Amino acid sequence: MRELRNTKIIAVDHGYGNMKTANTVTPTGIKAYETEPISTGNILEYNGIYYRIGEGHKEFIPDKAMDEEYYLLTLMAIARELNVFSIREADVHLAAGLPLTWIRNQREAFRSYLLQNPEVHYRFNGKEYHLHFAGCSLYPQGYPAIVNHLGNFKGTNLLADIGNGTMNILYINNKKAQESRCWTEKLGVNQCMIAAKNAVLDKFGVKIEESTVEQILRFGTADISAPYLDCISSIARQYVAELFSTLRKYEYNPDLMRLYVVGGGGCLIRNFGTYDKSRVTIIDDICATAKGYESLAYMSLKRRG
């Protein structure tokens, strides 16, 4: 969070797997209850309905403005970021983003969606929040994550933002984003998750917990027997190979350019990929894109005076 003229600039990265702010990460799973849930933890109360947030992930949808739950998740993310600084009431300028190839067509609809209520009262984890929305800045996903690294960029570079639902691809030449050379592929980490769970079911006839698969994808191992680990690792290697195959479809050549990877898919490339580590940079900070949104919005608003 940043502050400018008594307005809190809060960035929210609306992922399919996780909602990220500059300082928080929360899985996107959300479930509604008519009465307050018995157990505590990540409970949003809005318009008389209770929502438990953080168990599981949302499915891919091509237009987030058509899903009311992303508005609720936005309120949750803002509350979590404000809570880091013990703030309960604020004038808020939102900074968010959309996939590279979708932002032109969806920008204004998504902005209206996020700003649908100029003033909002709600409770999160038992604490009252009162927000006044002052505005919203929207940016292409992925690119903001590397803004602070642009000083290291020379010649041709390729950015791959691998999230839970999509992979966004963008060429950056001489530190400038090439808007005519950007693509979005539905090849997010969830595709690997589904394939791994199905492979275990097909081979061993058992269902495996998603959290176990997630641990393997993130860290390369888990406390399970070797045959199961080998099965999931094989699927992960196939998925990473498909990622690189897709990048080559868009003329990726490691001899001629450097590759920068952001998003949750970076850990899969590190754990299961075969690549030249001197030519590929994996940015591990899952909040990097949100931090980039925040920086860009702050600079833009400051220039306006």
Identify the meaning behind each predicted range.
Residues M1-L159, K176-Q191, K203, S211-G305:
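Nucleotide/phosphate-binding catalytic cleft detector across ATP-hydrolyzing
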Residues T21, I169-Y171:
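Conserved blade-register residue in beta-propeller folds
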Residues I162-N168:
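Ser/Thr-glycine-rich phosphate-binding loops at phosphate-binding pockets of nucleotides
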